[in-house]
Amino acid sequence: VVDTVKKLNWGPDIIHVHGWLASLLPLYLRTYYGNEPLFDGCKIVTSIYSQDFEGTLCQDLSKKISFDGIDGAQYAHLDTPSYLNIMKTAIDHSDAVIEGSPDLSDELSAYLKKATCPVLNFHNKDEFSQAYIDFYKSKVLGA
């Protein structure tokens, strides 16, 4: 996706990442692609859900990321690549976070409370549309 954006020469205002499968994108956009003019000023929003996975991903994940020349301090959580630690890394490299589920784990909720970026708490489907618009305007684009 990132290379497609580069080929089209289209600089997005916001990139909204959903769930753990895309959770490494904020890290890569801020580090590996950090000097790309197309992403300068781009805001990254990550939505977090309660759909985690059991166990950990490949224990070599940190080695694979270091191969791309990214400083280990940027992904220190990934020494143990669990769902919680992958999402912590996404939060650390996002400009804003949205709680996409009402039942996040206690550990993830506690980490979100300490986040330095704006966090939109969960809203049910009847009210999330306006809440997202307001959040984007005031906290993401207005920040």
Which residues does each predicted region cover?
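Catalytic cores of nucleotide-sugar-dependent glycosyltransferases that transfer UDP/GDP/TDP-activated
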Residues: 1-143
